[in-house]
Amino acid sequence: MVFTKDTKIREIIQHPSFRGFGHLLFPLQLAFHPEETVQDVTDSNHFIWYSNLKTKTSLEVLNNLLERAQKNEQIFFPIYDEDEMVKDPSKRETGLFYFKGKEYEKFALINAGGGFHYVAALHDSFPQALALSQRGYNAFALIYRPKKAYEDLAQALDYLFSHSSELKIVPDQYSLWGGSAGARMAIRLGNKSELQRLTRTSIEPASMVVSQYTSYSSVSRDDAPTYANCGTNDWIANWQVMENRLKNLKKLGIDSQFHVYKGLGHGFGIGKDTVAEGWIDNAISFWEKQINK
């Protein structure tokens, strides 16, 4: 079976290859109707606050996951153990979707936005993760609880560092990525002090952070090098606030790079078929620059 634009959400969620986690492919908090199709839900009425949603992009992601799962590759990893999930059943609503790159290569952890109301992974983290894996990097897209987002991101980092050998990933010089609310998560956990406060193990700070369309403005000497982008027509995140933040990072001696795209609105994701298309290659180059320092 190959998923198409006419495949129903129910068919994807209940697919045997996605048993136990298929429901996490779509936003739990928005409760899409199971009889709607992939094409039906790929719009801003379903993924609220987002723009530039592409059915083709969603299908590329879903079919990649399906193909790998059918080859008996583990594509989903819970971040909490069974005892923790029994004590707090909401922790079952979390986990990492794995987009595999080269063995023993560095990893990226990507957080979709959704206003801390839902997790827009299918548009705002899965496509970026797939693109990173195609470049050879191991990429993990986090499904988190919107009201406990920072706790879940910290737990995800703990999990990846604790299981790096089994996952065949290199934990050093990892990167944190995020869009909108997910960008706030990446920025905060990319900060050395916040990382030490929130994680339970000794974890090195991220080598860099990717921050898409967020008006987060605070800076600290503990912040990570940052690549950021936004559109001029973003009515949620002001691009000038973002630009000023990165200028302030530079004043602190922290490497940063900012890109603004004329006419783009909030939540353009990977930017397919827009003036932002290809931004992810620039972000990867920025990451590689930090790695090679």
Give the positions of each predicted feature.
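N-terminal targeting or regulatory segments adjacent to alpha/beta-hydrolase or S9 domains
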Residues: 1-93
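C-terminal catalytic histidine-bearing segment of alpha/beta-hydrolase fold enzymes
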Residues: 1-16, 20-27, 229, 252-293
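Short beta-strand element of the alpha/beta-hydrolase
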Residues: 105-114
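Short amphipathic alpha-helix adjacent to the substrate-entry channel of hydrolases
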Residues: 121-140
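Primarily recognizes the serine-hydrolase "nucleophile elbow" in alpha/beta-hydrolase
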Residues: 151, 155-223
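Short beta-strand/loop motif that positions the catalytic acidic residue
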Residues: 222, 228-230, 234
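Conserved alpha/beta-hydrolase "acid-adjacent" motif
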Residues: 235-244
